[in-house]
Amino acid sequence: MLPMNPKQMKKMMKQMGIEMEELDAEEVIIRTSDEELIFRNPNVSKISARGVETFQIVGEYEVVKRPPKISEDDIKLIMEQANVDEETARRALEEAGGDLAEALMKLQE
């Protein structure tokens, strides 16, 4: 493919109904169930074509693990089964990644 200057490329994209916009983003965070991908100072492009908007994110990112979600019912169960206070039960569940059996085993050692 022949190299094309940016102005020609933009004109051609516009003729095809594709619009591209650079966004001045400071940070982008993508959250999954167990981690966050944090992009600081990314290059973000918004591409609109045929009524669909697509975002392109380019840059370095950091992966941060999210703490497990621990329900009050889980805490109460651990408190009853291991005969411990709420703080101890919560800490055991956090250390066990929310795994009830592992938290109980650690407390019963």
From Swiss-Prot:
SMART domains per the UniProt record, alphabetical: NAC
Gene coding for it: nac
Recorded superkingdom: Archaea
UniProt-listed GO biological process terms: protein transport
Molecular function in Gene Ontology: RNA binding
Domain NAC-A/B, first and last residues per copy: 3-70
Name assigned to this protein: Nascent polypeptide-associated complex protein
UniProt family annotation: Belongs to the NAC-alpha family.
Keywords on record: Protein transport, RNA-binding, Transport
S-S pairs: none
Chain's role: Contacts the emerging nascent chain on the ribosome.
InterPro entries reported in the protein's UniProt record: NAC-like_UBA, NAC_A/B_dom_sf, NAC_arc, Nas_poly-pep-assoc_cplx_dom, UBA-like_sf
PROSITE patterns assigned to the protein according to its UniProt record, in alphabetical order: NAC_AB
Record NCBIfam families: archaeal-type nascent polypeptide-associated complex protein
Pfam families: NAC, UBA_HYPK
Lineage of origin: Archaea, Methanobacteriati, Methanobacteriota, Archaeoglobi, Archaeoglobales
Subunit structure: Homodimer. Interacts with the ribosome. Binds ribosomal RNA.
